[in-house]
Amino acid sequence: WLMIIEQKCNIIVMLAECVEAGKPKCHKYWPNDNMEETYGIVSVTNKEEIKYCGFTRRILLVSAKLKDGSVLTTVTQYHFTKWPDHGVPQTTSAIIRMHREIMKANKDLIGQSPIVV
């Protein structure tokens, strides 16, 4: 989360599930819907979670008290949920729709910020 704040990232893209084929693949780094979690000096609140066919969009409010002041920013996470444990998705429609939404959201942001994948 400190990297997200430092680099002023507004979009995170996640292409994997946390557990695939019964094995952990990724640590869940966000709180459940309408919940807050603290990760070190960073607090993350899941303000909104919208499930689409093939992906979930989460609006995360990220805050931290740093040496040089407090930071409060909004980060949107796009979580692709249709990738099978092995192989590739049967169709590309869900990932293309998610990609289009990410590109539109990034274009609408003021200033440039890297997208974290």
Curated annotation (Swiss-Prot):
Stored Pfam families: Y_phosphatase
Keywords: Hydrolase, Protein phosphatase
Reaction it catalyzes: O-phospho-L-tyrosyl-[protein] + H2O = L-tyrosyl-[protein] + phosphate
Residues binding substrate, per UniProt: 85
Keyword presence, Iron-sulfur: no
CDD domains (alphabetical): PTPc (cd00047)
Enzyme Commission code(s) on record: 3.1.3.48
Chain ranges passing through the membrane: none
GO molecular function: protein tyrosine phosphatase activity
Keyword Membrane included in the entry's annotation: no
Domain Tyrosine-protein phosphatase residues, every copy: 1-117
Family assignment from sequence similarity: Belongs to the protein-tyrosine phosphatase family.
PANTHER family named among the record's database cross-references: RECEPTOR-TYPE TYROSINE-PROTEIN PHOSPHATASE, TYROSINE-PROTEIN PHOSPHATASE 1
Protein's name in the database: Tyrosine-protein phosphatase 25
Native species: Styela plicata (Wrinkled sea squirt)
